[in-house]
């Protein structure tokens, strides 16, 4: 039994069902309107000119331009290309089966080793500098780089009186 729009009956709880039906009708209408808007947005309005060549031929020409050997013959890479040794291939194959956590741990260990070696090298350089080991023996250093002996303060104070 259909009720007129806006009728809310109070007998036997019909008002809740009527309100629910009105909400469903309203949401269905909104969904239909939304679908129409989406269809219009997806509609293609582009037209292809008939006098130009078809798109696939243009794509093939583009691909052929990059596949030609003329580009690679004249190009020289600024990077060194070092071929893999057998040990390198074995290492790569071994590492490909390792989980990511193990690889991250290995990289951290390598970074720690490099850091430790850097600290040790810096310590050795400072030590060599202090001992004047790093200077070439044949050349004399300029006067401003030569160490000056400390002045005797006691002689200066007694000499001025």
From Swiss-Prot:
Positions of disulphide bridges: none
GO biological process terms held by the UniProt record: embryo development ending in birth or egg hatching; negative regulation of signal transduction; negative regulation of vulval development; regulation of DNA-templated transcription; regulation of neurogenesis
Primary location class: nucleus
Region of interest called Disordered, as start-end residue ranges on this chain: 137-161
Subcellular location: Nucleus
CC annotations in GO: DRM complex
Protein keywords: Nucleus, Repressor, Transcription, Transcription regulation
Presence of the UniProt keyword Amino-acid biosynthesis in the record: no
Known partners and oligomeric status: Component of the DRM complex, at least composed of lin-9, lin-35, lin-37, lin-52, lin-53, lin-54- dpl-1 and efl-1. Interacts with zft-11; the interaction is required to suppress the activation of non-neuronal genes in neurons.
PANTHER family, per database record: LIN52 FAMILY MEMBER (PTHR31489), PROTEIN LIN-52 HOMOLOG (PTHR31489:SF2)
Family from the record: Belongs to the lin-52 family.
Function comment: Synthetic multivulva class B (synMuvB) protein. SynMuvB proteins are required to repress the induction of vulval development by Ras signaling and probably act by forming the multiprotein DRM complex that represses transcription. In association with the zinc finger protein ztf-11, negatively regulates the expression of non-neuronal genes during neurogenesis.
Protein name per the record: Protein lin-52
Organism field: Caenorhabditis elegans
Gene for this chain: lin-52
């Amino acid at each position: 039994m259909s009720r007129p729009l806006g009728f809310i009956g109070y007998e036997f709880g019909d008002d809740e069902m009527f309100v629910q039906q009105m909400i469903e009708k309203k949401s269905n209408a909104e969904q239909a309107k939304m679908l129409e808007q989406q269809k219009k947005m997806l509609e293609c309005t582009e037209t292809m000119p008939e006098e130009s060549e078809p798109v696939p031929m243009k794509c093939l020409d583009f691909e052929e331009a990059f596949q030609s050997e003329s580009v690679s013959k004249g190009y020289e890479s600024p990077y060194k290309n070092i071929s893999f040794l057998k040990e390198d291939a074995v290492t790569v194959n071994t590492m490909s089966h390792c989980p990511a956590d193990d690889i991250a741990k290995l990289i951290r260990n390598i970074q720690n080793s490099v850091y430790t070696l850097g600290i040790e090298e810096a310590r050795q350089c400072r030590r060599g500098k202090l001992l004047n080991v790093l200077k070439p023996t044949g050349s004399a250093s300029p006067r401003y780089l030569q160490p000056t002996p400390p002045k005797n303060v006691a002689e200066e104070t007694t000499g001025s009186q």
